[in-house]
Amino acid sequence: SIPAAAVSQGAAEALVAAAEDGEPARLVTDAHTEQARTRTVLAELPGSADGQVIMLGAHLDSVIDGPGINDNGSGVAALLEIARALGGTRPQATVRMAFWSGEELGLHGSMRYVATLAQSEKDAILVYANVDMIASPNGFAGVYDEPGAAVGSATASELLGAAVTRNGGTPVQVNLHG
C-alpha cells in the first residue's frame, strides 16, 4: 500500500519542487487511529408490488475540515423531507431510504450493506439515487452515470435529467473517469 496524507498547499509545493530536483520525499506523521463501530440507518415504506424497490441514500458523516451542513446535512434533510411527503401513501414500489455511515472514509456503510444482500435482494432494486451535497451555492444539476453500471442506470439518468429540464434546469452529464 502507498501511504497518503493531506498537506498544506505550501508543503505540497515544496514536495513537488524537491521531487523535480530529484530529492527523495520523506513524510513523517503523528497520527492516532482507532477502530470504531458505526451504524447505517434504513427506513422503508412498503409498496404494493412485490420485488420492486426504489432506493435513495445519503451519508451521515462529513469530512473533518467541513461544516457538514452541505456535505451531507443537505442530503439527509432532503431524504427526511421526502419521507415526510410520502407519509401515508402506498407507492407501487417499496421506497427504501439508507442513511449511510462511513462514506467519507471509504463508503464503508454502503459497501457493507451491498455485501450482505442476497442476489434476489439486489435484483429487486430498480434504481438507486444518491443524494449528496445538494445545497451548495456553487452547485449544478448533475446526473452521474457510471459506465458499466447496472442495467437500467442509463434509463434512470435520462429520467432524472428530464426532471431537471422540466423544472427549468439544464442537466449536466458528468464523466467520473477523466
Question: For each of these PLM feature ranges, what is it?
Answer:
Residues 2-14, 51, 64, 90-91, ...:
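Metal-dependent peptidase/peptidase-like ectodomains
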Residues 73-81, 108, 112:
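Short amphipathic alpha-helical face segments that pack within enzyme cores
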Residues 2-69, 81-88, 92-94:
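Soluble metallo-hydrolase cores and metallopeptidase-like ectodomains found primarily
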Residues 96-98:
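A structural signal for isolated positions on well-ordered beta-strands in alpha/beta enzyme cores
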Residues 70-74, 148-151:
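Alpha-helix N-cap and loop-to-helix initiation/capping positions
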